[in-house]
């Protein structure tokens, strides 16, 4: 919407992919995937589809450009900006941003660096959920965490590129006194002939020859 002229322009239609959450099943309008930020000159906005970033001309006169060059859709990974104390909504041409790449097939997550030319650089990746807490004022160091079923979300300290990581807390030492568990990704075909995915949690001493009670959660 142009406040000066009152003109409304659809700036995302030419992208060719839905900009809303297609799988949304609530009795309400589906939410948009959202906005990643803006260019410093104020002429473009970065929008998300299910996988990638799009650089979109606010006037609608120029064709949208896929900043991430379709990498997310090609590899089945959702690329999103990660939060931290240095997060910006406005990006200069020479800036980089830390993004997460969540693999929709394996459920693994990666932390990458994305520049404004669309180049991605992998910093770390694995069967974890990652969170960034703070970068140092000089942007040389970072505090972050990772977690999964077997690893508690302790704090880690590293260089800003996440190299040479050192765990600095041990918040859940009592975990070592208990039998814990494992998890694996399972897939099946539902009654609509569509593939579903789920996480199967097993006890630490699981014996496939025995029967166990099962709890199932659908969401």
Regions found by a protein language model. Name each.
Residues 1-32, 46-54, 73, 101-110, ...:
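A flexible loop/linker signature enriched in serine peptidases of the S9 family
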Residues 29-30, 38, 126, 178-181, ...:
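Short solvent-exposed loop/turn micro-motifs enriched in small/polar/acidic residues
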Residues 6-30, 67-89, 170-184:
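Surface-exposed loop and turn segments in beta-propeller and other repeat-based domains
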Residues 8, 35, 43-45, 52-54, ...:
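Beta-sheet entry/capping signal
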Residues 131-219:
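Serine-hydrolase catalytic core recognition
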Residues 1-3, 37-38, 44-52, 57-58, ...:
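Beta-strand C-termini and the immediately following turn/loop, strongest in propeller blades
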